[in-house]
Amino acid sequence: MDDNNYQILSQLRENVISKMRIFVDKNNERFFSDNELLQLSDIEVSFLSRNSISRHGLTTNLDKSKKLSPSNCKVKLNKKLFEEKYFLYAEFVLFHEYIHCLGNFSHDKNFRQLENLWPEKKQMNIIGRQLTRELQEIKAQWAWTCSKCGFVVKRSSRKFRSNYFHKECLGKLKNIPIIRPTSLEH
């Protein structure tokens, strides 16, 4: 990892941990102890090797025979998160992954309660959907096009059945390849 990427990831880690430090319950008790935050700061954070469409972050258990914990995991983030317009969302994604690192493997009620501590959580969900749509647009190689109303759904895979219909107008869908201009055609 080059110095610039290291600095970006370090800054992101610092931002998230400093926010986690101030999360308190109604009795003014902190949700995350200094020890937990110190352990989180030692977790390796890097980039996903392939930019997935729907995966914005990933926590992996290093030793599958042991329980997920800060000393037994690493976090990978989608590179697209580091565009300026997504940087605040990147903080939320790292926070989400850190909750996993603290042993909260499933997205259960307890996990969601911790996740809801994040400021502007609803806005983060909107930004997350926006990022997913943008990634879908980039990766799309096929367009399902309605023969009746012209509605288009872009898809990354060719998987298609000839009996697909648009649910709004019941027009038959056609699977059309998306042809992008090459760099020589610009």
Task: Describe each PLM feature range.
Residues 6-84, 88, 105-186:
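Metalloprotease/metallohydrolase-associated module, dominated by Zn2+-dependent proteases
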Residues 92-104:
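Active-site recognition of the HExxH zinc-binding catalytic motif
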